[in-house]
UniProtKB/Swiss-Prot annotation:
PANTHER family listed in its UniProt record: AB HYDROLASE SUPERFAMILY PROTEIN C4A8.06C (PTHR48081), ALPHA_BETA HYDROLASE FOLD-3 DOMAIN-CONTAINING PROTEIN (PTHR48081:SF32)
Motif Involved in the stabilization of the negatively charged intermediate by the formation of the oxyanion hole location, chain numbering: 119-121
SUPFAM superfamilies, alphabetized: alpha/beta-Hydrolases
Disulfide bonds: none
InterPro entries named in the record: AB_hydrolase_3 (IPR013094), AB_hydrolase_fold (IPR029058), Arylacetamide_deacetylase (IPR017157), GDXG_lipolytic_enzyme (IPR050300)
Name listed for the protein in its UniProt record: Arylacetamide deacetylase-like 3
Amino acid sequence: MWDLALIFLAAACVFSLGVTLWVICSHFFTVHIPAAVGHPVKLRVLHCIFQLLLTWGMIFEKLRICSMPQFFCFMQDLPPLKYDPDVVVTDFRFGTIPVKLYQPKASTCTLKPGIVYYHGGGGVMGSLKTHHGICSRLCKESDSVVLAVGYRKLPKHKFPVPVRDCLVATIHFLKSLDAYGVDPARVVVCGDSFGGAIAAVVCQQLVDRPDLPRIRAQILIYAILQALDLQTPSFQQRKNIPLLTWSFICYFFFQNLDFSSSWQEVIMKGAHLPAEVWEKYRKWLGPENIPERFKERGYQLKPHEPMNEAAYLEVSVVLDVMCSPLIAEDDIVSQLPETCIVSCEYDALRDNSLLYKKRLEDLGVPVTWHHMEDGFHGVLRTIDMSFLHFPCSMRILSALVQFVKGL
């Protein structure tokens, strides 16, 4: 009996070691870390840990133990939360939607700005716990009331469930600002990555709601703003740079939007949409809208291939503005509030921010733009990661705080 147990334990150890070595080798063969990225060794370690969790999640999914998103979320939520004595944190629900409310402990009679925060993670990972440190710091340093929304996500809930959850939670919050001591003239929606996309959509959805306090500003941190064109300069230049590599981008898009993975090459070549659609949106998505300095390194303009009709029938949801807020009509975008956009140089989604910035500015919407020359996608999440912390994360937080204080 004991011999059998020892054999099983040894086999498990060898298998675990093999998985770890495979992840490390795969990292060095497939991932590119530019010299200009701050702390490249840290980034390699962070990406290997990230990939190891994804790989084990995939293994457990194949063994039908649990899904990859469930495993990843379980692991990411294991570390205990650190509470700041100057911030009061309250957990409750708007109906079935869990939220965390962060309020400065020092009581005053004056109303404070309110920030509704939607966490990132591609609808796959991320949670109220993973973004607790960000929201707590944002609350304390900007002297604001922060509401973090715990929307439903994969594997059970796909697009547009996360967006609808966040919209419902935001409306609940806007209808009860007095209860939280929030100034109705200073409500901000904010999100990073997938959460940035949600912030953009929520803002657009609320422009025609005169029954609610008007959103004062939106903060979009390396946001996913369109799902049409995956051949922008940044996609070509940065698709092998962690943490958002091409393989994870595909997983995120195909799982959230419920596409068949067989369309990957078709979408890459732009053959998933008809010529008239590309022509219609060229004025907003064309590379001429991106400053020349961002096209100097490894960009090649590629014509879109003829449409694959079967692919178009399945993936046309990318034309929904709840999926691609960047292509909303002018009469909506022109009504949007003051905007703060944060982009990172080493991010495949960088150009989403640049294109939306131009759209907003062309329509007269004030934009504050912060571009992190040494930043990468997901860097803000490292703000509380001790030895894996990147200084760039503090600069992003500082930019957000100054923006909120200036409203």
